[in-house]
Amino acid sequence: MLWIDKYKPTSLDKMDYHNDISINLKNMIKSGDFPHLLVYGPSGAGKKTRILAVLQEIYGPNALKLKIDHRTFKHPTSSKNIQITTISSHYHIEINPGEAGSYDRVVIQTIIKEIAQSPPIDSGSLGAFKIVILNEVDKLSKDAQHALRRTMEKYATFCRLILCCDSTAKVIDPIKSRCLGIRVPAPSQEEIEKVLAKVATAEKFDLPSKLAVNVAKQSGGNLRYALMLLESQKAKQYPFQSTELPLLDWENYISQIVKDCFEEQSPARLSIVRGKLYELLGHCIPPELIFKTLLLEIFKKLDHNMKFEIIHWASYYEHRSQIGSKPIFHLEAFIAKFMSVYKKYNQ
C-alpha cells in the first residue's frame, strides 16, 4: 500500500494541519444543519481527505467501506452508452462527471435522482440524507452546471452535494451561492516536513532533515506529491546517499524543450518542440502543469526585462487552453510567441 493511502487520516480529529477547518466542519455537523459544500483549493492540499473524514463524522466508520463500480448510462435521446467509474458506500457516491465528456449533464442528473430516491436507512437523524461527491466540478460544461443547479434544488431533502475543485473561477455563480464554500489552502513547507517526519518514524527509517526540506520545497505545497517523492527516493536508495532530488522524467523532458527553444527559433525547431509537447500530453501530463513548468524553466534563463511580457503571453494562452478543447494548439502557440519575442529581443 502506498504511503499516501496507508497514512491518510480518516477522521477530522486526526488531521495534521488546518485544524480550524476541521473544528468548523465538526461544529457544523453537530448543529444538524448540513448544507451543500463547495470544497476548493490547490492539488494535494487535502480536500478529498477532509471530505471522507466528514463522511466518517456523519455516518461512522461504515462510510469508509468503499466499493468501485463501472456504471453504464444510456442517453435519453440516443443509443449512446456512457461509461464512468464510481466509488460508493451505503451512504454516498463519488463520481467524476468529466469522464462522460459532453454527456456530463446526463450522468449528473441520473446519479443525483437515483441517490435522492433511496435515503439511508440506518443513519439516524444526523445524516438522514445521502451525499453525492462530484470531483473536478470546475471542468463541467456550462449546460451541466445549470442542470446541476436545478437538480440540487429539486432533491435537497434527501441528498446533499459536496463539490470538489481546484478553483471556483469556472463554477457558475448560481451554484456557488447555493453552497457553503470551504477553501483548503496548501500546507506550509514546515507542515509538510512534519508529516514527512511522522511517516518516517512510522516506517522506522532515518530521514535527514535536509532531505525533508528539499522534498517539501520541490513539492510546491502538494503533500501527496511530497509523500510519493519521498517513498520513491527510499525505494531507489536507502540509506540515503544524497539529499539532492533528481527531476522526474517529464520535468527533464520540459527542460529539454526549453533548451531547444533557447538554442534556435525557427519553424523547423518549433515542429520538433510540437512533437515533444504531443509526447507529454500523450503521457497524461495536464496542460496546466505543462504551462506552469515551461514558464518556470524559461524564467531560469530569461533576462529580467523580458519576464513581464512572457508572463502575459503564458497567462493568455493558458486561459485560451482552458476555454478550448485542444491544448496542443495553445501550447504550441505559446512556444511560437516565446520564440518570436526572444528572437526579436536579441536582434
Curated annotation (Swiss-Prot):
Subcellular location: Nucleus
The keyword DNA-binding belongs to this UniProt entry's keyword annotation: yes
Subunit structure, interactors included: Heteropentamer of various rfc subunits that forms a complex (RFC) with PCNA in the presence of ATP.
Family: Belongs to the activator 1 small subunits family.
GO molecular function: ATP hydrolysis activity; DNA binding; DNA clamp loader activity
A GO biological process held by the record: DNA repair
Major location (coarse): nucleus
UniProt xrefs under SUPFAM superfamilies: P-loop containing nucleoside triphosphate hydrolases (SSF52540), post-AAA+ oligomerization domain-like (SSF48019)
Gene3D superfamilies: 1.10.8.60, 1.20.272.10, P-loop containing nucleotide triphosphate hydrolases
Function according to Swiss-Prot or TrEMBL: The elongation of primed DNA templates by DNA polymerase delta and epsilon requires the action of the accessory proteins PCNA and activator 1.
Protein name, UniProt field: Probable replication factor C subunit 3
One Pfam family hit: DNA_pol3_delta2
Keywords for the protein's UniProt record, in alphabetical order: DNA replication, DNA-binding, Nucleus
